[in-house]
Amino acid sequence: MGMRMMFTVFLLVVLATTVVSFTSNRVLDPAFRRRNAAAKASDLIALNARRPECCTHPACHVSNPELCG
């Protein structure tokens, strides 16, 4: 293998390692889970606050069927 090919393989290994470690840290991190749950709750509260206008708007109604029943 030439130097260029070895360098390319090295970069691919580093990239793959970085991606795997980044995603596994996010999945296992309890603080990330709490932040994610808080963000989802905040989004749901915001959607409920605009429920009347969302249910009368066809595009919003289709995107959020759980709000309008």
Curated annotation (Swiss-Prot):
Bilayer-spanning residue ranges: none
Compartment list: Secreted
Entry GO CC: extracellular region; host cell postsynaptic membrane
Pfam family, one: Toxin_8
Tissue and organ distribution: Expressed by the venom duct.
Disulfide cysteine pairs (residue numbers): 54-60, 55-68
InterPro entries: Conotoxin_a-typ
Keyword terms: Acetylcholine receptor inhibiting toxin, Amidation, Cleavage on pair of basic residues, Disulfide bond, Hydroxylation, Neurotoxin, Postsynaptic neurotoxin, Secreted, Signal, Toxin
4-hydroxyproline sites (modified residues): 52, 58
Modifications after synthesis and translation: Two 4-hydroxyprolines have been detected by MS but the assignment of which of the three prolines is modified is uncertain.
Chain positions listed as propeptide in the UniProt record: 22-49
Region (Lacks the Ser-Xaa-Pro motif that is crucial for potent interaction with nAChR): 56-58
Record's signal peptide: 1-21
Modified residues (Cysteine amide): 68
Molecular function in Gene Ontology: acetylcholine receptor inhibitor activity; toxin activity
Domain of life: Eukaryota
Further comment: Negative results: neither MrIC, Mr1.7b, nor Mr1.7a inhibit alpha-7/CHRNA7, alpha-3-beta-2/CHRNA3-CHRNB2 and alpha-3-beta-4/CHRNA3-CHRNB4 nAChRs endogenously expressed in human SH-SY5Y neuroblastoma cells. MrIC does not activate alpha-3-beta-2/CHRNA3-CHRNB2 and alpha-3-beta-4/CHRNA3-CHRNB4 endogenously expressed in human SH-SY5Y neuroblastoma cells. Mr1.7b does not activate alpha-7 endogenously expressed in human SH-SY5Y neuroblastoma cells.
Record text about domains: The cysteine framework is I (CC-C-C). Alpha4/7 pattern.
Family affiliation: Belongs to the conotoxin A superfamily.
The protein's name: Alpha-conotoxin Mr1.7a
